[in-house]
Each structure stands twice: as structure tokens, then as C-alpha cells.
């Protein structure tokens, strides 16, 4: 019979497992489709909260509800989708976002039972391109923000734009669907000479035997290339459309849409200082194309980006302006007034009074009586989609807001045992759930996220507190009664997506990255002994302005030294290395010194994280010295910082296949250092979570002695060691 050791672990699950380094924002609403009057598809291209997916909504007696979630083979492995979808007969295509750029798009088809399922992929190449290139920032960004792919389709023809062709860096590939439903490569659409940054294939459309490919960076104002399919099935370039009168940098071709067999609408969202325009073109009797009209936004204002997205149904055309209304967004509707391509402004869709809406109009879908508007930047880029419906008299109602999944529900009052590998909806193995508080339960507004957690035990009362880094500050939760946690309040600070929190001498210290003049915030935790009527907003005891923003914070509690790393903005930065701060008097910090390394990936000298302590390990040469074990992106660096005016590097070590040395922690006896490399899983140098074990008994010569492989391919992020147990946070 199996028995369990009862170790209580308080984990910051508030953000939900899976937030990647760049993809903490899901972007739900980046693309939308309405394949049927009572059905809507919404793309969630990133994996901030669960795998990237397409969510299916149906209209029932009680309104719109999610009925299915679709994943690709790639998204189930942690890959993103692109940001476009295209309908095809019996299904749709969703652009891929795999970092290896092996897949152009994934196909989905409706089964006999009406449910959707993946139906195959449109491959770009058979295997990933081999690369002998060492890890660089360029490779990192290609992994974290994979090259964009765009998909368009009509009938049995699909177009995919992807990196790799022509001098401008992209190519547009043609795919044909066979009788068995599989897609195969059928050539490419070649525009001819393209300049660098033409962004060829940024937007595409297909209708019958015509294809339109936008290149918003080509020429002075952007260009759209038109191709026609011949009797032999081959495609030839027919025209290059431009409107120089729009002015330089207009971005013509950022969106394209056939509004008829001989009509084309083209967005130029950067025209006129990013107010935006939509240019209408028509094919004449002789086969030539010419400009027929230019559509303007329904209201004045700069930065509207009118023309970012287009959708049409019958004699209705809608145009997205996601920058309108101070970034909230708007969608303008137009009605055809004559057969010669004339359009008039009809009405506008607005997000109403809903809070935290941003980028409304970034994606559109339209069918008679139904409009769907994507708003992927809303709620902190978690994303929203809005549904509008028309009455018989032509009036529109809405919005009805769609979100990715039901809001999480708090789990409190009683322990939930792990049974059949599940506990209250979470996967588990030999770990029972004491409680779960979603973001809303710790005071977070929609769109906030959580990026770090620490803890404090009151030495007088024995009460335990969780300290949680929220976008809007540091949230404090009393976890003394583990199954009944109580949210006490928040210490507000400049908004940040990446915080670090540590405790010294009964004081909380925390930082924020990318948060301007955030400073080092200090809060006396003994104030928690008498909190009336929680939750409350706590005023910090100090904001030390010796630094601006910082990615991570380390505290050596033995020496009373704080270290910020990857520090930026005003104040001390130390080139991204160790900013040393004397905090022996918590409310009177003093700058103590700098250490800037020669290692680094994002830039030379950048330290990502560290563990610093008064060394009490086996290497007698350094006993009693204050040392930092620094994760410096490309190497593990051990530094003697006892003399803050003259820190001395002791050693640096790496290993074959290093991708990004992120963080690590010493064993309690100081003989071993356990390290996580954040990117090795993502770049493919390991197929499972790998923890690297160093023998550091000789600090002058650290040696890798083992690798521990986890049971899945999650990316390792942070780990801590207490006694004979290691606690890892992976995504």
C-alpha cells in the first residue's frame, strides 16, 4: 500500500500553468470565422492559459456557449498558431506557428456527427532545417516569436505565406486539395523583384481563379499583386496595384478582400498618420484593374488603423479600426449603393462600456445577420470576441462577449485528494490540492497576470502568508489555514508583467520589470498582524529609487544584501549584472556596488538570476565568503562579492548544447547546484524537461555530473531545494 508524505507546498497557480516567456497573453480573437448562422470559431493563437487552440461556439436557447476546443498536433506540443484562419468547403485552415517552420497550416474538418477534428497539415518542408548556429538572440526570438505564416483559401485552393522565398524573405505557396481531402504543394506565386521588408504575403485572398497578395512594404505606399489561374491550372501575375497618393508608408496591402468576382478591397491602415484608408479596385471590361474609390473612417481621430481587417457578406462590408477611440477600437460598416462599386457608410460597431477592451476590430467575420469582431489585445491580451446580431428591421444588437473558457472557480474549504490523476480539474500525481484561488479572488482585474510568489511566516504568531506578484502590485494571502486562504490585500506598484519578491528581516522587497521608475518597494510585514476588514490597499513603507525596473531580485539573508539583475531604466543598472544593495536597515537601503559579467545572450553582461549566500559549503577556500551563483544566460558564473567594491569572479562553466541558463539552486549541503536551461526543450536539444546537476565541491572547477529527465516535454523555468526535495515550476 502506498503512503504519502504530507509536505505542504504553497504554489502560485493563479496564472494557470503554461505561461511562456513571451506567450503569457493568449490573443483570443486574433482570427474569427462564422461558418454557419449558429456557429462561431475563435482563434487563441498562444499558449498563455492552456494550449493554443480554436474554440467553437454555438448559439442555443440561452445564447452563445463554447461547445468544443480544437488543437493541432503542434499546439499539443506547446507550439503556437499563426494569427489567421481561412474557411474551405467542409472545414477551415489555421496558420501554423511552429518554430521550425515545417508546417504552413493545419486543416480541420467537420465529421459526420457535426464535431470538428484535425484533418491534416499543409507542409512547408519534410524536416526541420539543420542549424549549426550557436544560440543567439535572433534564434531565441525565432523560437519565442516564430516566423509568421498567413493562410487564405477558396474551394480547393489554399495559399500560405511563410519565410524562405524571394529576396524579401517570404514566399507564397500554392496548395491543392485532392479528392481524398489531403493538401499537396502546387507551386508558388512569384511577384518578381521585391525589396527588403516588402512583407510579401502579409495578407492574401483567393476567389475563383484570382489571388491577391499584399506587400505593404513594397513601393512607397504598399502594393498588392494580382495573379490569375490559367486553363492549365498554372498561376501568372496579372497586375501590381498601388496608390501612391496615399503617401509613404501607408501599408497598402495589410488586408485584402474580394468583395465580388471583379472587385477588391485593400486596407492601408498606416495611411494619413495611421488614420487609415481602404482602397477599392475593380476589373474593367478589358481585364485591367483600376482604383474606383477610397473609404474613410466614420469618425475623425489619429492612430485608428482603419483598414486593419476586412469582411464582407452580400452588399455589406465591415472595416476594422482597432486603434480608434484611444485604442479601444471600432468597426465601420458600409453598404453597397450601386452596381458600379459605390459604397456608403451605414453604421458602426463599438465595444460599448465594457472594461479593458483594446484592439477591437483586429479581426472580423460577417455573414447575413451576424458579425463577429476579434479584440485580441483586450483584458491584458487574454483577448475577447464580440458578437452582433441583426433584427428583421436591420437594427443590430450587441455586443455579446465571448472568452476563452469559463472563468476559473475557487477551490476552498476542504482538501481535494488526487484521485485518478485529477484533483478539482487539475492534473496531479501523489499531490493533493489544499486550495486554489483564481486571479479574481486575489483582487486582480481582467487581464492581470501573476509572475512570482514567495512566503513569510510570522515569527511571533506563526501565521503563514503567501506573497504574490500580480501585474498591479504584490498581493498578500493568509494561508495559515491551508484550505481556507484569505486574501488580505495588495501593495500597489507600477504595472509589470514580471515581478520578483523576497523577504528579509520581516520585510517584503519586490521589483517590477519593464515598469519604468518602479524602484525597490519595501513593506513591513508585521503590519499584517492587525488587518481590519480585508481586503485592503496597503501603502508601501518605502520605494527606493536607486533602481528603476528589474527582472529578478535576490536576497542574501545571511549578509543582508539584496541584488537586482537585468536592471533597466533610471538609477543603477550595472550593465544588466548584479546591482548590490545593503538592506541591513530595511527601510534605509544603500547602493553597495556592481558586478558586470562578460557572459550573456540577450546582451553581454546580463545576469538573469542568481542565488547569493554566505558560503558554508565544502570548499574551505571560500568558507565564510559571500558568493553568488549567477545564471548568466550562457554560463553559470560563481562570483565572490564579499568586497562590494571589488567583486571577484571565481569560475564560469557551461555545457554542450547550452541554450539559455535561466536559474538554479544549491543543495542544502552546498555540494550540488541544480540548474534549469529554459530553452533547451524549445530548441530541441532535449525532448523532455532536463535538470542539469553540477558538482560544486570545488568552486574553481564546477563539473556537470548528471542530467535528470522529467516525464514530459515541459520547459523548465524555476526550481528551489529544501531538504531532500526539489520543487520545480515548469511550463
What role is predicted for each listed range?
Residues 22-731:
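Feature marking well-ordered beta-strand scaffolds used for ligand recognition
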Residues 1-2, 24:
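Initiator methionine at the very start of the polypeptide chain
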Residues 10-18:
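Bacterial N-terminal signal peptides
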Residues 2-9:
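Bacterial N-terminal signal peptides that target proteins for export
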Amino acid at each position: 500500500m502506498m503512503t504519502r508524505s504530507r509536505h505542504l507546498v504553497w504554489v502560485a497557480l493563479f496564472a494557470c500553468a503554461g505561461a511562456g516567456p513571451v506567450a503569457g497573453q493568449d490573443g483570443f480573437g486574433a482570427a474569427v470565422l462564422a461558418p454557419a448562422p449558429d456557429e462561431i470559431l475563435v482563434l487563441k493563437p498562444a499558449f498563455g492559459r492552456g494550449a493554443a487552440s480554436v474554440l467553437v461556439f454555438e448559439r442555443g436557447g440561452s445564447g452563445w456557449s463554447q461547445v468544443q476546443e480544437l488543437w493541432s498536433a503542434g499546439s499539443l506540443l506547446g507550439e503556437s498558431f499563426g494569427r489567421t484562419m481561412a474557411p474551405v468547403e467542409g472545414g477551415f485552415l489555421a496558420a501554423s506557428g511552429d518554430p521550425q517552420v515545417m508546417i504552413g497550416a493545419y486543416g480541420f474538418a467537420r465529421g459526420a456527427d457535426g464535431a470538428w477534428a484535425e484533418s491534416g497539415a499543409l507542409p512547408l518542408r519534410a524536416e526541420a532545417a539543420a542549424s549549426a548556429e550557436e544560440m543567439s538572440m535572433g534564434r531565441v526570438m525565432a523560437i519565442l516569436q516564430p516566423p509568421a505564416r498567413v493562410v487564405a483559401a477558396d474551394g480547393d485552393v489554399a495559399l500560405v505565406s511563410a519565410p524562405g522565398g524571394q529576396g524579401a524573405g517570404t514566399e507564397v505557396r500554392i496548395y491543392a486539395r485532392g479528392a481524398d481531402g489531403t493538401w499537396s504543394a502546387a507551386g508558388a506565386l512569384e511577384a518578381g523583384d521585391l525589396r527588403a521588408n516588402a512583407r510579401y504575403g502579409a495578407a492574401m485572398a483567393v476567389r475563383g481563379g484570382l489571388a491577391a497578395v499584399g506587400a505593404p512594404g513594397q513601393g512607397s505606399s504598399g502594393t498588392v499583386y494580382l495573379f490569375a489561374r490559367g486553363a492549365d491550372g498554372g498561376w501568372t501575375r496579372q497586375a501590381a496595384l498601388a496608390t501612391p497618393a496615399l503617401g509613404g508608408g501607408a501599408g497598402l496591402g495589410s488586408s485584402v478582400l474580394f468583395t465580388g468576382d471583379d472587385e477588391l478591397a485593400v486596407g492601408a491602415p498606416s495611411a494619413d498618420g495611421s488614420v487609415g484608408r481602404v482602397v477599392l479596385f475593380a476589373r474593367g471590361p478589358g481585364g485591367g484593374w483600376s482604383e474606383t474609390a477610397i473609404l474613410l473612417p466614420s469618425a475623425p481621430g489619429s492612430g485608428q488603423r482603419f483598414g486593419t481587417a476586412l469582411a464582407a457578406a452580400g452588399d455589406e462590408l465591415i472595416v476594422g479600426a482597432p486603434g480608434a477611440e484611444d485604442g479601444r477600437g471600432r468597426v465601420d460598416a458600409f453598404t453597397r449603393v450601386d452596381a458600379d462599386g459605390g459604397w456608403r457608410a451605414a453604421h458602426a460597431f463599438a465595444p460599448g462600456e465594457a472594461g479593458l477592451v483594446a484592439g477591437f476590430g483586429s479581426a472580423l467575420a460577417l455573414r447575413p445577420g451576424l458579425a463577429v469582431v476579434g479584440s485580441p489585445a483586450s483584458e491584458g491580451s487574454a483577448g475577447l470576441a464580440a458578437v452582433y446580431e441583426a433584427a428583421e428591421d436591420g437594427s443590430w444588437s450587441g455586443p455579446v462577449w465571448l472568452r476563452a473558457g469559463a472563468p476559473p472557480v475557487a477551490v476552498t474549504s476542504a482538501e481535494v485528494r488526487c484521485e485518478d490523476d485529477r484533483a478539482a480539474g487539475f492534473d496531479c500525481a501523489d499531490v493533493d490540492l489544499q486550495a486554489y484561488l483564481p486571479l479574481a479572488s486575489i483582487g486582480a482585474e481582467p487581464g492581470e497576470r501573476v509572475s512570482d510568489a514567495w512566503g513569510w511566516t510570522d515569527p511571533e504568531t506563526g501565521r503563514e502568508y503567501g506573497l504574490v506578484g500580480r501585474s498591479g502590485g504584490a498581493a498578500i494571502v493568509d494561508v495559515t489555514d491551508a484550505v481556507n486562504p484569505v486574501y488580505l490585500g495588495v501593495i500597489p506598484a507600477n504595472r509589470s508583467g514580471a515581478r520578483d519578491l523576497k523577504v528579509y528581516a520581516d520585510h517584503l522587497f519586490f521589483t517590477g520589470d519593464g515598469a519604468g521608475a518602479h524602484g525597490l518597494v519595501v513593506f513591513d510585514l508585521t503590519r499584517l498582524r492587525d488587518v481590519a476588514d480585508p481586503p485592503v490597499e496597503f501603502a508601501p513603507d518605502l520605494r527606493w529609487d536607486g533602481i528603476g525596473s528589474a527582472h529578478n531580485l535576490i536576497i542574501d539573508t545571511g549578509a543582508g544584501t539584496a541584488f537586482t539583475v537585468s536592471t533597466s531604466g533610471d538609477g543603477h543598472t550595472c550593465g544588466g549584472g548584479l546591482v548590490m544593495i545593503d538592506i541591513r536597515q530595511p527601510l534605509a537601503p544603500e547602493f553597495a556596488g556592481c558586478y558586470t559579467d562578460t557572459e550573456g545572450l540577450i546582451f553581454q553582461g546580463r545576469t538573469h538570476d542568481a542565488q547569493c549566500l554566505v558560503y558554508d559549503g565544502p570548499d574551505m577556500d571560500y568558507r565564510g565568503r559571500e558568493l553568488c551563483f549567477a545564471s548568466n544566460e550562457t554560463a553559470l558564473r560563481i562570483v565572490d562579492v564579499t568586497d562590494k567594491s571589488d567583486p571577484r569572479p571565481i569560475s564560469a562553466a557551461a555545457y554542450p548544447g547550452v541554450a539559455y541558463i535561466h536559474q538554479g539552486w544549491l543543495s542544502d549541503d552546498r555540494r550540488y547546484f541544480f540548474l534549469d536551461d529554459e530553452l533547451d526543450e524549445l530548441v530541441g536539444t532535449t525532448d523532455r524537461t532536463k535538470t542539469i546537476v553540477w558538482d560544486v565541491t570545488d568552486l574553481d572547477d564546477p563539473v556537470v555530473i548528471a542530467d535528470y529527465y522529467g516525464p514530459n516535454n515541459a520547459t523548465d523555468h524555476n526550481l528551489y531545494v529544501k531538504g531532500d526535495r526539489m520543487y520545480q515550476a515548469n511550463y
